[in-house]
Amino acid sequence: MARRDEEAKEFEERVVTINRVAKVVKGGRRFRFTALVVVGDKKGRVGFGTGKAQEVPEAIKKAVEAAKKDLVTVNRVEGTTPHTITGRFGSGSVLLKPAAPGTGVIAGGPVRAVLELAGITDILSKSLGSNTPINMVRATLNGLENLKNAEEVAKLRGKSVEELYN
């Protein structure tokens, strides 16, 4: 039980959306709830999960468990991203631009939840295309996953980090 308590303290969770869905059967409609949850440690690890159940708390619990199984590590430089990037998923895309210290997180709804829980404190973002919460979350995570720091770019180009900036 002690390990579970440590894990609970390590990650912060944020419910992005809760949706009531219906299955139409002969006798009428059967309602269930879906939950979209983002979890992160504010130190560069973030993930999302979805859960479905007949009760809201149970759906949230399932979503949190799913999110903890699929965490992404984010490259950060002084509280922002190393470079501008566009994350895409389906017909939704999210533009992420690094910002100067003190700018804060300029993002809407689902994108804000992902960025804050990833530990990014200064960033500009713009949601383009589809604004479905799950598409926005996945597009944001796609962008964050594809970020490269200066060392990785230098290695890909066969140069030193100093040569990149000159």
Swiss-Prot record:
<comment type="function">
    <text>With S4 and S12 plays an important role in translational accuracy.</text>
</comment>
<dbReference type="GO" id="GO:0015935">
    <property type="term" value="C:small ribosomal subunit"/>
</dbReference>
<dbReference type="Pfam" id="PF03719">
    <property type="entry name" value="Ribosomal_S5_C"/>
</dbReference>
<feature type="domain" description="S5 DRBM">
    <location>
        <begin position="11"/>
        <end position="74"/>
    </location>
</feature>
<keyword id="KW-0699">rRNA-binding</keyword>
<dbReference type="Pfam" id="PF00333">
    <property type="entry name" value="Ribosomal_S5"/>
</dbReference>
<dbReference type="GO" id="GO:0003735">
    <property type="term" value="F:structural constituent of ribosome"/>
</dbReference>
<dbReference type="GO" id="GO:0006412">
    <property type="term" value="P:translation"/>
</dbReference>
<keyword id="KW-0689">Ribosomal protein</keyword>
<dbReference type="InterPro" id="IPR018192">
    <property type="entry name" value="Ribosomal_uS5_N_CS"/>
</dbReference>
<dbReference type="InterPro" id="IPR005324">
    <property type="entry name" value="Ribosomal_uS5_C"/>
</dbReference>
<dbReference type="InterPro" id="IPR005712">
    <property type="entry name" value="Ribosomal_uS5_bac-type"/>
</dbReference>
<dbReference type="InterPro" id="IPR020568">
    <property type="entry name" value="Ribosomal_Su5_D2-typ_SF"/>
</dbReference>
<keyword id="KW-0694">RNA-binding</keyword>
<keyword id="KW-0687">Ribonucleoprotein</keyword>
<comment type="function">
    <text>Located at the back of the 30S subunit body where it stabilizes the conformation of the head with respect to the body.</text>
</comment>
<dbReference type="GO" id="GO:0019843">
    <property type="term" value="F:rRNA binding"/>
</dbReference>
<dbReference type="InterPro" id="IPR014721">
    <property type="entry name" value="Ribsml_uS5_D2-typ_fold_subgr"/>
</dbReference>
<comment type="subunit">
    <text>Part of the 30S ribosomal subunit. Contacts proteins S4 and S8.</text>
</comment>
<protein>
    <recommendedName>
        <fullName>Small ribosomal subunit protein uS5</fullName>
    </recommendedName>
</protein>
<dbReference type="InterPro" id="IPR013810">
    <property type="entry name" value="Ribosomal_uS5_N"/>
</dbReference>
<comment type="similarity">
    <text>Belongs to the universal ribosomal protein uS5 family.</text>
</comment>
<dbReference type="InterPro" id="IPR000851">
    <property type="entry name" value="Ribosomal_uS5"/>
</dbReference>
